[in-house]
Amino acid sequence: MSTQPATIADSATDLVEGLARAARSAQRQLARMDSPVKERALTLAAAALRAAEAEILAANAQDMANGAANGLSSAMLDRLKLTPERLAGIADAVAQVAGLADPVGEVISEAARPNGMVLQRVRIPVGVIGIIYESRPNVTADAAALCVRSGNAAILRGGSEAVHSNRAIHKALVAGLAEGGVPAEAVQLVPTQDRAAVGAMLGAAGLIDMIVPRGGKSLVARVQADARVPVLAHLDGINHTFVHASADPAMAQAIVLNAKMRRTGVCGAMETLLIDATYPDPHGLVEPLLDAGCELRGDARARAIDPRIAPAADNDWDTEYLEAILSVAVVDGLDEALAHIARHASGHTDAIVAADQDVADRFLAEVDSAIVMHNASSQFADGGEFGLGAEIGIATGRLHARGPVALEGLTTYKWLVRGSGQTRP
């Protein structure tokens, strides 16, 4: 009887199974750790990141050079790039997570039954979480910190674009965590860039409890289509800002410019600007964008505002550009804005700029997105800006968690039932 040679997929499955079993063992230890122990370990991990600045930035420079040579887009390169300031921000985010309240063990609800039994619903970790991501070295630190603080083990599979950055960050993190008593297997980096490893993670039902993808549309779509493990994700960030007729012009101009141009490659960036037909200064909204180098694509009424606005194609309204391109439409009031958003939004973040509180309240109530804003830039769609510390991602689904997913979103719960000998009649 002949035996078939092992395939790449078989090898990847064996690799992921080994990582997951080690992660499960480490997670059981982590779940028993007192909150101060986890806090100290993460504080040490943040310090280790700061101490390894030179090594991490050198690794990132190698990734940036490779990315430029391989033709990565400006948006991807922006996500990949680390500077001393960005690295300091990553370390600060880890330290901030260390100081957050530990959700594990929180009593969500408690009730006494007529028969004397006492029921409690208590937060517990999800278990082993797989994070699959592209060109975002900050995710390595953010995900690790959030998982450890919430008692979960993490299996990290970063993109090939950031391979050197991820390894350097992971090395520093694990050293700091180990100094604080957290087993190294609690945060593991998949050691291969073979795509078969992604497939193995997606098929690891019973070994990995949840998958969180962070990356482009094709990655997230593949994860959602192929996973046999629950997925927490968003597919697109087609975010709208509606400037109502009542908006303060100075406020509207500042918010619109920031929402698009602060960082065009983040998932909270505005991709469509909706201008009320009776707003008094539409040119004051588009001119700063054009002057900043943003390409505008508009409908007929938008193009009448400024001749530099190009015609929009039908698919522009459904496009997440992640670069300095913006769709612009003029709408007849709130109802038409709501209809446009309902037709084209991805459920991520949508905003209104308005002085009329009744209009704003209706917008907040009727827009069905994970994050809905009034008089604020959509670039605030971020766990850190929400006071959650780092975030593991932004979820737009209906189940479990929506919006920025931080500590609470990485927990589930169990029921504790305390009796005194009750039997059921």
From Swiss-Prot:
GO terms for cellular component: cytoplasm. Pfam families: Aldedh. InterPro entries: Ald_DH/histidinol_DH, Ald_DH_C, Ald_DH_N, Aldehyde_DH_dom, Glu-5-SA_DH, GPR_dom. It is found in: Cytoplasm. Signal peptide: none annotated. The keyword Nucleotidyltransferase does not apply. GO terms for biological process: L-proline biosynthetic process. Its EC number is 1.2.1.41. Pathway: Amino-acid biosynthesis; L-proline biosynthesis; L-glutamate 5-semialdehyde from L-glutamate: step 2/2. Keywords: Amino-acid biosynthesis, Cytoplasm, NADP, Oxidoreductase, Proline biosynthesis. Its main location: cytoplasm. GO terms for molecular function: glutamate-5-semialdehyde dehydrogenase activity; NADP binding. It catalyses: L-glutamate 5-semialdehyde + phosphate + NADP(+) = L-glutamyl 5-phosphate + NADPH + H(+). Belongs to the gamma-glutamyl phosphate reductase family. Catalyzes the NADPH-dependent reduction of L-glutamate 5-phosphate into L-glutamate 5-semialdehyde and phosphate. The product spontaneously undergoes cyclization to form 1-pyrroline-5-carboxylate. This is Gamma-glutamyl phosphate reductase. It comes from Novosphingobium aromaticivorans (strain ATCC 700278 / DSM 12444 / CCUG 56034 / CIP 105152 / NBRC 16084 / F199). The gene is proA.
